[in-house]
Amino acid sequence: MSTQTAERFSRFADFYPFYLAEHSNRACRRLHFMGSLLVLIILGYALVSQKWVWLLAMPLVGYGFAWIGHFVLEKNRPATFQYPLYSFLGDWVMFKDMLTRRIPL
């Protein structure tokens, strides 16, 4: 597994290139995309059906897909462990960038 940098990021704009470098494997990015998409679907279902217990599945699905991508495909440690907030934001920015085809899906 690759080692994380000891660098601390004070701005998300500085963190995001590091985040993308940790997601160089296309299959890993696709797993992130699927996890994020399923999180949105679960959220929509919970809101429409008012079955709030489904909200508990959101972190399991979102992080589950992402972590499989990191440990199995990227062979690195998810940035979430060192940068939880920036990593969470990075997931959604990367999702948007894949939707808009700025990053290949």
Residue ranges of model-derived segments:
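Short, amphipathic, aromatic/basic-enriched membrane-interface segments that mark the entry/exit
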Residues: 21-32
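Transmembrane helix interruption/hinge and helix-loop junction motifs
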Residues: 46-54
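Transmembrane alpha-helical segments that form the membrane-embedded catalytic/substrate-channel core
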Residues: 61-74
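Core segments of transmembrane alpha-helices
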Residues: 31-45
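Hydrophobic alpha-helical transmembrane segments
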Residues: 55-60
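Structural signal for membrane-spanning alpha-helices in multi-pass inner-membrane proteins
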Residues: 43-46, 69, 98
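Membrane-proximal soluble regions of multi-pass membrane proteins
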Residues: 2-19, 75-105
